[in-house]
Amino acid sequence: MLGHFKKATTAPKRFIKEINFSADVNSNLANLAVGALITNDLFQVGDLVDVTGTSKGKGFAGSIKRHNQSRGPESHGSRYHRRPGSMGPIKGKLKGKKLPGHMGHETVTIQNLAILSVDTEKNLFLIKGNVPGPNKGFVIIKSAVKKLTKEQTHAKN
């Protein structure tokens, strides 16, 4: 990767991400050079944004925790407590079947979050809602694709 940074004449960065945008939508971004710093002046207070990040990994989880399935009876001779149940008369596993497995560590997009405040000095946003991933994790903030109407916005708040 050092060759890429040398060719772009920039210092090595922790994350590299290519983001496509339309020049007529964001005229501020049309004249940016490769490796230039993008500040938070693209968004204002009250804008709706989509936040994409990698959710926290939870490790191996059973079907009750992973897919919110019901558990079996706990007493009266039951041996079926936290198991996924019968798979039916099938050969092999069906794709997408709700079974135990790895939970979390997936790319997640939370849509239509409102920007409450913008700090231009520290280059920070205050976003209302859940942002995926751990503290100090890498997220991508884009303008909302599925904009809410005024009635939906009031119902959400």
From Swiss-Prot:
One of its GO terms (cellular component) is cytosolic large ribosomal subunit. Gene3D superfamilies: Translation factors. GO terms for biological process: translation. Residues 57-98 are annotated as: Disordered. Keywords: Ribonucleoprotein, Ribosomal protein, RNA-binding, rRNA-binding. GO terms for molecular function: rRNA binding; structural constituent of ribosome. The keyword Lipid metabolism does not apply. InterPro entries: Ribosomal_uL3 (IPR000597), Ribosomal_uL3_bac/org-type (IPR019927), Ribosomal_uL3_CS (IPR019926), Transl_B-barrel_sf (IPR009000). Pfam families: Ribosomal_L3 (PF00297). It comes from the Bacteria. Belongs to the universal ribosomal protein uL3 family. Part of the 50S ribosomal subunit. Forms a cluster with proteins L14 and L19. One of the primary rRNA binding proteins, it binds directly near the 3'-end of the 23S rRNA, where it nucleates assembly of the 50S subunit. This is Large ribosomal subunit protein uL3.
